[in-house]
Amino acid sequence: MQDISNHTPMIQQYLKIKSQYQDILLFYRMGDFYELFFDDAKKAAELLDITLTARGKSNGESIPMAGVPYHAAEAYIAKIVKKGLSIAICEQTGDPNTSKGPVERQVTRIITPATVSEEAFLDNNQDSILVSIFEKNNKYYLAYTSYTQGKIYLVKTLTSLNELKNTVLKLSPQEIITNSRELAQQNPFKKPIKALEEWYYSNFEAKKYINDSLDTNIANNILNLYKNDKLTTIGSILSYLTNILKDTPRHITDISYEQEQDTLNIDINSRINLELDNNSKSSLLSIIGKCKTSLGSRLLKRYFSNPTRNLNILATRHSIINSLGENQHFLKIQDVLSYISDIERIISRVALGTVKPKDLVALRDSLEQLPILKKLLSEKNTPEITNINNRIHQLDELVTLLDKAIIENPPTTIRDGGVIKEGFDKELDELKSIKDNSYDFLIKFEELQKQKTGISTLKVGYNRVHGYYIELSKQHADKIPTEYVRRQTLKASERYITEELKNFEDKVLSSKEKALAREKLIYDTLLKKVIEYYKQIQETAASIAEIDVLANFAERAIKLKLSQPKFNNLAKLELKEVRHLAIEHNIDEPFIPNDTLLSKDTNTLQIITGPNMGGKSTYMRQVAQLIFLAYIGSFVPASYADICDIDTIYTRIGASDDISSGRSTFMVEMTETAYILNNASAKSLVIMDEIGRGTSTFDGLALAKACAEKFAQIGAFTLFATHYFELTELAKQYPNVCNIHFEAKEYKDNIYFMHKAVTGAAKKSYGIQVAKLAGISQDVLESAKQNLYNLEKKQQLTESTQVQAQFQLEPTTQNPLQQKLDAIDINTITPLEALNILFELKKR
């Protein structure tokens, strides 16, 4: 630590505390403000758009300073946290009246992007995820916590950086911690990440924090169930939370292991390509996700992150969707759900000590809806719905307690009181009555003093600095009674106090202090009572989320005309009248649906040709989106869907330069293609859109053919769109390859797209007609037509087009004469040998 002896005592204190939190902003409490100094002040001024000032000098230099009001700090902190930064809150813990030198201060809380619970800091519809990555021997052990959910999840051991990146980005964490400084420095995730000290990833410390933080039975089970490396990863989260909270994270009550083999895997590029869950209005999530509660919205996002292949789970979801869809019963349920607040996060705030009085009112109002919800669910007497209903706890006793205790519209915090309802506590009511009755006393006292002095302008008042006073103008100085003691002198008046008024003041102020202390005690006792229901409320919240998602699926099924998918073990994917929901939603004319059939018994690879804008990309995407929807338990946009076991969806759709890594569009395309080729299996769905465009025609065609052949050999269900018509010949070479194309019609030099998939290969690409639609000028179009004529008839425009025209899909063999000539070593051959070879070649 640098020498700080030349600084003022207060700045010395600040620098000592700041040295422990060098990488985060320090909010240093001074009176009614949080102040920031030096580099923190400069950074905060820029981030928060607040004034950067200076606080005198220390060590001979001006001290940069910026600050935010204590009462408004939450809004400023929210801005910082949402930018991925962390904050240390340093409060005054000493008594200013007894302190010698600077008031004692301590960091009471650290706020990081993933460890916040206050409503202002959180996205209601998204989990707050903290990921821990433990790197050891080129393996990655990963765990994560949904902070306000009170759970830790273990993920399977990962063996490659690419696999790690896909897993982490799928979770979309707010914050990442790791033991690897190299990983933190590289940050391939582009998320807030920090490398922690080694002890956070000590197996000994991990077991200690597991025992200290978790219920004894849970801790023992975890210690017996998992090996050291997984325990280390769990322990790193618990130790980090303990350090952040400055307390044991008792709200963590569950640790579970995610079974990777039960999920449909989709890498991050494919998620982006398919527009599954990004923030755009055309994403699948924005169309499917119409949940009524934040609880349901977050659960739906978890479904999107981890689609399940467990057919029992899917059958249960489908059964509930059908039941709720009968007579549109979901409408009644959704109406009740719309009145239920985020009780999962509210009870977490109670456990973490960040709950606000209004949260308790919201909790009460939400719990009041549970009897109605349970009655509606009981009307659908199916085992699946009954199971959910049994996990919704009707907490009438807690509702009654909160209703009696908290006023209807409480203040933001308990700090100044005014939260507890009159009649709840007799002692508190008595203390408040002293203050409430003070007005009557002051009116009578003022009237008595006016009579006593004969001064009609005499006033009795109060301010926070000087307390109660009697105010008289200076012109009445000769009428001041002897018992009046001067308290304050103003420009035109004097303020006095009497012994009677002083006694009243002491009594009132004492009652205020006692009432506030009593109210805080009642409030704390109330919170302890509420926390007794923690597990029941968490379980209730989870069940409400589940029924919200499934009611949403039922509503979407009717609104969007979705049908229930079937699942088979016959290696067959049969889809009829499939639609693309986003496009259907955004166009005025009717959407043209298409059928898809892929089967191990017929064909597994479709070569798809046809004009741009003809519907090839839409066709491929809608198949992938349908399978995805089926595996989250939703109904699907098709009149019929029979789906086999698909374990992974891969897509290669579009590309752009990766400038930061120095990679061209073609390099990005080839990297993604290599990943798919190396990982695809017979249980994969592969979407390949126009591969080989970023290089020469010859190279592109060769690569596209080789990739298509590989997918045919693997047996992966593959939709392969291409402009290389030569690839349609593959259907003659491979029995599991077929051709389909999208038709277009020409009429009076215009083109009309049919958007219908038809068996066979396309005969034209209609590129010039599409260019016309795009607005290319007529002179350029005429020139293009002439060029096309030359290419098709003369094939002499350029050397490369000659090569393309002559290019055959079959492998070429070298001429035997050429082989013989290549084998001759002209440096060692004799003239006689040369004549003999020439004679032999001539005979051939």
Curated annotation (Swiss-Prot):
Stored Pfam families: MutS_I, MutS_II, MutS_III, MutS_IV, MutS_V
InterPro entries, alphabetized: DNA_mismatch_repair_MutS, DNA_mismatch_repair_MutS-lik_N, DNA_mismatch_repair_MutS/MSH, DNA_mismatch_repair_MutS_C, DNA_mismatch_repair_MutS_clamp, DNA_mismatch_repair_MutS_core, DNA_mismatch_repair_MutS_N, DNA_mismatch_repair_MutS_sf
Membrane-spanning intervals of the chain: none
Organism: Francisella tularensis subsp. mediasiatica (strain FSC147)
PROSITE patterns recorded: DNA_MISMATCH_REPAIR_2
Protein name: DNA mismatch repair protein MutS
Keywords: ATP-binding, DNA damage, DNA repair, DNA-binding, Nucleotide-binding
SS bond list: none
Function: This protein is involved in the repair of mismatches in DNA. It is possible that it carries out the mismatch recognition step. This protein has a weak ATPase activity.
Residues holding ATP: G610, P611, N612, M613, G614, G615, K616, S617
Cellular component annotations (GO), alphabetically ordered: cytosol
GO molecular function: ATP binding; ATP-dependent DNA damage sensor activity; damaged DNA binding; mismatched DNA binding
